[in-house]
Amino acid sequence: MTTETLTQLEQHELFIRRHIGPESTQQQEMLNFVGAESLEDLTQQIVPGSIRLNRDLAVGSSCSEAEGMAYIREVADKNKVFKSYIGMGYYGTEVPSVIQRNVFENPGWYTAYTPYQPEIAQGRLEAILNFQQVSMDLTGLDLASASLLDEATAAAEAMALAKRVSKAKKANIFFIADDVFPQTIDVVKTRAECFGFDIVVGPASDAVNYELFGALFQYTNRFGEISDHTALFAELKAKKAVVTVAADMMSLVLLKSPGSMGADVVFGSAQRFGVPMGFGGPHAAFFVTRDEYKRSLPGRIIGVSQDTRGNRALRMAMQTREQHIRREKANSNICTAQVLLANMASFYAVYHGPQGLKVIAERIHRLTDILAAGLTAKGLELVNSTWFDTITVKGGDVAAINARALAAQINLRIDSANDNAGSFGISLDETTTRTDVSELFDVILGSEHGLDVAALDEQIIKADSASIPSELVRTDAILTHPTFNRYHSETEMMRYIKRLENKDLALNHSMISLGSCTMKLNAATEMMPVSWAEFGNMHPFCPLDQAEGYTQLIEELSAWLVDITGYDAMCMQANSGASGEYAGLLAIRNYHISRGEGHRNVCLIPQSAHGTNPASAQLAGMKIVVTACDKAGNVDMEDLKTKAAEVADNLSCIMITYPSTHGVYEETVSEICDIIHQHGGQVYLDGANMNAQVGLTTPGSIGADVSHLNLHKTFAIPHGGGGPGMGPIGVKAHLAPFVAGHSVVKPGRESDNNGAVSAAPYGSASILPITWMYIKLLGYQGLRQSTQVALLNANYVMKKLSAHYPVLYTGRNDRVAHECIIDLRPLKEASGVTEMDIAKRLNDYGFHAPTMSFPVAGTLMIEPTESESKVELDRFIEAMVSIRAEIAKVESGEWPVDNNPLHNAPHTLADIMDPAFDERPYTRQEAVFPTAAVKANKFWPTVNRIDDVYGDRNLMCSCAPVSDYE
């Protein structure tokens, strides 16, 4: 019998062993190899003593997965899921089970990374291309981006695009119709203030009275009215203004497209295409414009190109517009951008097809007609005379009606005194039934109303409803492409999703060692609560007493993150890391303004910074001054002192990353903070590398004032192929009054009236349970050990590879932090083999390439994370060593520079079936089975290397021609 205690047998710490890849014996082997006695010894060798944390985190002890699930269930059950008719951009929807099970809950979809390596991402690239096609068809415009963060931030991007492309160069006014959703107006105003734009809000017809560079309209408007703005748009465009429209995706199935009215930019939320409300997110936004504005489009664009065989292949197009290349000159700071949710929306459109979508839209509209007919028959007045799914009602005792509604677990939209005082709104959706409409009659009119839904339906059919004016009824065909007309049975849809999934490499196949990306385990237990209705079906603008579970979760998570970061407060609003940067910089900006120092607008940024840093600083209205790095990759202290002194009067802040983007703990980080503070500035510490800090040090103790946290990196939210993400910011007490507020939801904080950075008050709230579970399950012991094993794995890989590749930077005791950079430039010079060749060759070995040419061109940055086992690390090391041997054959002349496994990588099944392969100087086995490990678990790229130049010169961002399907 065992001699273990009951406490040991209860295995409260079992999840720690599930999350961390190397077992204890493997850890010791690795420690022995790198020359450390223990994880604590390794920590002391790597982390500077001056910043080391000498206490346990106050997050509680680890618990079992069963205990964690029980805790989160108690929290979820405190949410009261009412039937919400609030609308305002958030609606009930049915998530098709085939999509929920095979996409939303499938690690093959949610653990992939942004498709920078398109040869191993053709599946999700096709799904995103479908999303672009849906967006273009419904809006009637030429070119769509892949996805944006939400409708409100898309509106801000539309304003920025309008300023870039408008020919009214002297105009500085952006007009917003006063019937646009208030949260959208809020976010646009916040962005406009940073840019120095003048915002005018008024009735839509007033737009022509101003000299504008752009204008924004809502279609349908917040009260439900549908307006034909064709003449207004023409008048505005004659004055050189750019017309932007926020549109409802479901309504566009039935309504005349904004593009046909003359709109230049159309955007909106794709949430009601099968993505739960989730208390605000995550949801993908669509963004479509005219072809002539393609170079000014924000965010990713998926385009069609060809591979080396001339076959059709997909890729991210025109990347030179984006932050990772153009930095502060980029069109936007967009990086992570809700790709998983865009994929869900695109699959929703594929599954239902044009006819299925029309039935859904017509059902919503018919039920709205019935509701309107019944209420007006009983003497109530409607504010709007036209509608798709929303009516605004005047008359009756609104307070009493609302009280009856709440008693029946129904949420109505109660308009404020400034907006149709004494009225209430009702927005119906895909989940609304005839029973729901009958219940609404009971609540609004009393149970003796005598109305019958079926009878009202007959009346409407006979009367031929005019709630959508004939001139606004859509007459053109949508979604005619074969993709949207062939996968309508669940069997066919399941197979289509699987076929696309099989083209992609995700964490469910192998390690993804992207430096600065932290592709760690997204544990199933952490993910499961996201699917629960108690989290998914909550409207973000519901009364807060219905969201006690969310409130508790957010408060507990905020308290844990405050302790982990050493800050004093958290703000959960930002929907991505880049959005968090913007939010943090706004807090700094507003802090300076409050002190009468609004002139402080210079942001110092090291030349090694991630591209989002300068792009975000530019969005916050700051001027960027770049500081140099020394030969060791650290911030050049002399240059920093000089630059800080030169701009002292106008210094706003510095943006640094810690550990540095070069993968080392800089010894001078606290001195950097002191220098900035001495010159009146604030310190923004980018949280991209927080996975090397948790439990070992904190940004607050280092001396920083604000950081964003990538919850989709350090704290286990999956990357989703390019989103969702969360970028909450932690701040010191003096910045807490200046974090983002919200125009609709005001929980009673000092920051309530500040401008918003996202549409929802808590951003993508429905994925916060993942991070809550991650911290709850690991506890203080597991969080610290995870960080230590991340350091161990990185140093193990670094030391193993150092015998074959130069390691560019190391820190104290010749160690790296959680990632390492190998320098390929000497090999390129000696052999002609490029970093791109090595990246593509890794695909043949079944691996996603590490981060390429960042922060230094001609390098690979490797971050293995703590979740990878020694077996997987050794498999990756074996692949890299084998590739080095292949390079040696090119160096020696055995293989030609332009005809070898690296130059021709990746290899497909078509390659090895081609008789012409016999003419190559290497064998089929060398091409596709270079090691025994590859043979045991082969991943087959479905296209050869893609021609980027061809794709940009022949830009095509819609589905393939019908001939490809014949």
Curated annotation (Swiss-Prot):
Its EC number is 1.4.4.2. One of its GO terms (cellular component) is cytosol. It comes from Shewanella halifaxensis (strain HAW-EB4). The keyword Oxidoreductase applies. Belongs to the GcvP family. The glycine cleavage system is composed of four proteins: P, T, L and H. It catalyses: N(6)-[(R)-lipoyl]-L-lysyl-[glycine-cleavage complex H protein] + glycine + H(+) = N(6)-[(R)-S(8)-aminomethyldihydrolipoyl]-L-lysyl-[glycine-cleavage complex H protein] + CO2. Keywords: Oxidoreductase, Pyridoxal phosphate. GO terms for biological process: glycine decarboxylation via glycine cleavage system. It comes from the Bacteria. NCBIfam families: gcvP. One of its GO terms (molecular function) is pyridoxal phosphate binding. This is Glycine dehydrogenase (decarboxylating). InterPro entries: GcvP, GDC-P_C, GDC-P_N, GDC_P, PyrdxlP-dep_Trfase, PyrdxlP-dep_Trfase_major, PyrdxlP-dep_Trfase_small. The glycine cleavage system catalyzes the degradation of glycine. The P protein binds the alpha-amino group of glycine through its pyridoxal phosphate cofactor; CO(2) is released and the remaining methylamine moiety is then transferred to the lipoamide cofactor of the H protein. Its cofactor is pyridoxal 5'-phosphate. The modification N6-(pyridoxal phosphate)lysine is found at K713.
